[in-house]
Amino acid sequence: MMNSDQKAVKFLANFYINGGKHWTHGHLRQTQPEPTQPKASVLLLGPEPGMAWDETQPPKMKEIPVGLRLQTGTPQESLPTYTQTLRELLLEQRPLITADLEVPSPTRYQVPSPSVRESSPHPHYSIGCKHQGREGGGRRAWQTLWFQSESPFTQKADFDQEQKWPSPAHYQLLSRPAFPAFSFRGCHSASKTPEGHTHLGLPGARGLGLRVQPQSLLQASLQAPGKRCPGPNTYNILPGSRLQSPRSPAFSMSRSPAFTSWLSTSFSFGSPNPWPSRLPRGGLQLTLPFGAWRGHPGCTQTQAPRHRPLLHALEPAGHNLLGPATEWNHGLPRGFPRPPLGLGAPAWPSDPLGTPMHPSGWPTLLWAVDKAGPAWIPHLPISPLH
């Protein structure tokens, strides 16, 4: 097989032998140069050998292109000098060039000047339009849209010249129209904190007017007046860990699993229920805590307190439960039975340190116990157990 150089030599040799014409089809014949005229006709004759001129049919005049026209005249005046057929003449004719010569071909383009961060240049455009992307790539891809190069054969990262990573100081924040100031809600200013959110969530600080200076206020005071964008460490997380209301509700309509399980374990200390038949059906069944019983659960000496009537109240943690009944009984709903006044017993049994024992912090509920059994049993219209 011949290589490209041998094929080129053979092509030029055939072009020189054929008189400066390319071979297209069939055998090339040596013909004389034919002058061209504005308009002429050629006589196409095909007589058989030995036949006279008069015996032949009348000649047919056919119009041919300008480049292949002969001299004008009658058949007697101008003898035929071109003996090729019409098919051979059309095969040698070249089609006109319809392409625009001013437009560069796909394989012809101007090589751009090589960039500092690239080791090989690439064309400005390939098939489509040039992508107007931001400068970036490699270690400088802070604000670039595409990390890949425009050409699939080159890469933007040149680690031989980029020896240092950019610092966070090179990063520029986007303009205000580039990102929304809020998402589904209004923009919450970090420098404004509601008064109800500044109270400490501690029992001793309730009602004393103590306020907390959150970290967001300190960070907001250090910022410049023109900048309003808070940093990631300037958000106030204290309001989410406290009650949003200044005081707890008097009663709750929800069913807490912890409260339901606490009520369902009524008198489950290992001793029999002293009054199982006196509790009304659908009433409120409460459980006496461990501090209200003498001895240990399961022992023979374990018995209910019989020294005096005991009043138990379930109030939220942090309230003073040692006052008279008229002071802490204001949270009862309308129609709830009231205990007799003058009972100075602690509202809830306390541990040795004096801290009220309260398991869940639920609404105010009363329970009275005397020597003969429950003096009165609160009966709500709608039982929380049903």
From Swiss-Prot:
Residues 105-136 are annotated as: Disordered. Residues 107-118 have a biased composition (Polar residues). One of its GO terms (cellular component) is cytoskeleton. This is Protein STPG3. The lineage of its organism: Eukaryota, Metazoa, Chordata, Craniata, Vertebrata. The gene is STPG3.
